[in-house]
Amino acid sequence: MAIRKYKPTTPGRRQSSVSEFAEITRSTPEKSLLRPLSKTGGRNVHGHITTRHKGGGHKRRYRVIDFRRNDKDGVLAKVAHIEYDPNRTANIALLHYRDGEKRYIIAPRGLQQGALLESGPNADIKVGNNLPLRNIPTGTTIHAVELKPGGGAKMARSAGASIQLLGKEGKYAVLRMPSTEIRRVDIRCRATIGEVGNADQINIRWGKAGRMRWKGVRPTVRGVVMNPVDHPHGGGEGKTSGGRHPVSPWGQPEGRTRKPNRPSDRMIVRRRRSNKNKKR
């Protein structure tokens, strides 16, 4: 994926960059795999804001992605097109199966139009093929990994993401996550070979607030510049630091939102490193 920069004809143009979409082979999606997608604007059924900074954005239709691929074991599929998906950072690939069915999958890096893919325990170790973890060699780079057998891919689905299969211990496979966390997963879970494509998406500079509004993202305002009626950090004469430990607009201490003692935490072998401890 190449990134295009523009001449600075306007302030927004000066800062922004866009993808050249060189991998995209078709601009119109498969109509049979589209579903309507309604917007909530961050509100619940009562009309109350439950998630701030959401609203507006361009109209979208949801592309139905096959995250399981377990009912197509042994059926060859041809990559008909690589397409853009507005609902995720990764591109998607349209597969035409030998039995006539069409399905979308996450497009891995290096997948070409016309390639033949397969899923199942006997599939080759080839980019785009889907296999159980017990049939994948140690050290292989994978993505779209299940947390529970048959539950569908949950991990490593965004652009550029990948997981490394470190080893197998009895009925578990040991995985290194993109966050550097090392986790055990049931060896019956399935994964797709390769890493997710469109890795340069992280380097795109949006350049102006308007492009974020097209994505449905509204402005984020700091509490210290609000009035006291709007935020605990608001008010004061001149610029202030808030005068207390950081809190939410409802007075809850900032941070520590991760749920402790989740059932899946017992599968973690080593916690992820903090940013300051990560190897550069």
Curated annotation (Swiss-Prot):
Keyword Flavoprotein: no
Keywords linked to the UniProt accession: Ribonucleoprotein, Ribosomal protein, RNA-binding, rRNA-binding
GO biological process: cytoplasmic translation
SUPFAM superfamilies from the UniProt entry: Nucleic acid-binding proteins, Translation proteins SH3-like domain
Signal sequence annotation: none
GO cellular component terms, A-Z: large ribosomal subunit
Pfam families with a match to the protein in the record: Ribosomal_L2 (PF00181), Ribosomal_L2_C (PF03947)
InterPro entries recorded: NA-bd_OB-fold, Rib_uL2_dom2, Ribosomal_uL2, Ribosomal_uL2_bac/org-type, Ribosomal_uL2_C, Ribosomal_uL2_CS, Ribosomal_uL2_dom3, Ribosomal_uL2_RNA-bd_dom
Stretches for region Disordered: 1-59, 223-280
GO terms of molecular function: rRNA binding; structural constituent of ribosome; transferase activity
Bias-annotated ranges (Basic residues): 45-59, 269-280
Tree of life domain: Bacteria
Function comment: One of the primary rRNA binding proteins. Required for association of the 30S and 50S subunits to form the 70S ribosome, for tRNA binding and peptide bond formation. It has been suggested to have peptidyltransferase activity; this is somewhat controversial. Makes several contacts with the 16S rRNA in the 70S ribosome.
PANTHER family the record matches: LARGE RIBOSOMAL SUBUNIT PROTEIN UL2M, RIBOSOMAL PROTEIN L2
Subunit (UniProt): Part of the 50S ribosomal subunit. Forms a bridge to the 30S subunit in the 70S ribosome.
Family to which this protein belongs: Belongs to the universal ribosomal protein uL2 family.
Protein name from the UniProt record: Large ribosomal subunit protein uL2
Record organism: Corynebacterium jeikeium (strain K411)
